[in-house]
Structure formats: structure tokens, C-alpha cells
Amino acid sequence: MNIVITGCSKGIGAELVKLWSQDNMVFGISRDIISLKKIQKNLKRPSNFKFIAEDITKLTVNQLNTWISVDSIDVLINNAGFLINKEFEKINYDDYKKVMDINFWGSFRITQLLIQKLSVVNGHIVNISSMGGVNFSSKFPGLSLYSSSKGALTILSECLAEELKSYNISVNTLALGAVQTEMLNKAFPSYKAPTSAKEMAEYIISFCESSNKILNGQIIKVSKSNP
């Protein structure tokens, strides 16, 4: 399979690259070129990972076509995320723009760019949201901007599940609970999550490889704890 993963330099994204690249071609994007090179160097099959160190919100068509040289993409994982832990009254426009650009607009844009490649093979788009971005879940002080951005991504998924039916593309959302990553440490510094990044990556891979045949437009809560 050909797989595209955004936000793949750390945490769950990095674990997805390590696992999926053993038997598949993985295309990754992140701004952190040092981490991308380190991941590639330590892979069992380094040639199965082709990355671009670029801001996902500024990716051009020419850059994408150079980076992803194949005609079809089986799975797109919109995993890129950024968190600012700040009291609501102190959030400014720069905070808003950075979080929304990465957590929402980046996923929006790369999905637009890959529709044709995904349509070739009845592709599967999986948007990585958060328990904080869905209804009827606990919300936490300082995370209003992050949760709102993930809520926007969740609604986008539902819209695209309908709009992309004509392309035979399935779109689903995984709303993740607490996973032990750097981002969790930023949100909850003293908290120890019950799920590791590798464990969550294994679940995501299993979901992506099978669920597009029977699911579309679904929001799946994947959580042992929140946080």
C-alpha cells in the first residue's frame, strides 16, 4: 500500500511510520527534518519512507507531486497537531492562527491535493481528532483552542464523508483519548497515560486497513482515559 502520514516526526506519527514502512511505502510530512532523518535511518527498510520537511499549510502542488511520485494513495492519515495550553482570556490571534492552521487547515489542504490519488483505489482518509473535540466528553481549562480546532476537524470529516462518496473515498475520524506523547506532557505534565504511542499506532493501522470497507463518516472514540 501507499500511505501518507502528516505530523510524523514524533509520537504516534513516528510509530506509524516505523510499523507501516516494514511492508508498505510511506510518505511523511513534518517540519522537523532532524527527527525525520533519524526515523528514516533507524527503519528496517529506509527506502520505504519518503519524507518532505515542510509546513503542511504551505505545501504547493509541485512540491506534493515531487514528494509523492506514485499515482495512487491507499490511506491518508491527517495526524499533524499542535497544542497551546493557555487560559482562554490570554489567547491571541497568533495563537489561534497557528493552532487552526496546523490542526484544521493543514488537513483540509492536503486532503484537497490528494483526492485524485485517493480516488484511484477507493482510498481511506482517517482524521486524528481528540476526545476534547467531540460532544459529551470532558473538557479542560487551557485547552479551549486545541479542542475547538479538533472539533472543526471532526465536523470536516463528516462533511467529506458525504462529499467524497462520488470518488469512492471513505472518511472516518478517530477521537483519541490520553496517549503518552510529548503533546500530552504539554497538556497534563504530571499525568501518565495508560496507552503508549506504539499501542495507539497499532490500533490505527488495524482500523485503517479494514474499516473503509464497512465504515464511512464515523467518529470513533478511542480512549481508556480522558485524560
Where do the language-model regions lie?
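Catalytic loop of short-chain dehydrogenase/reductase
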Residues: 124-152, 157-158, 162-165
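Conserved glycine-rich cofactor-binding loop
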Residues: 9-10
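Conserved glycine-rich Rossmann-like NAD(P)H-binding loop of the short-chain dehydrogenase/reductase
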Residues: 23-38
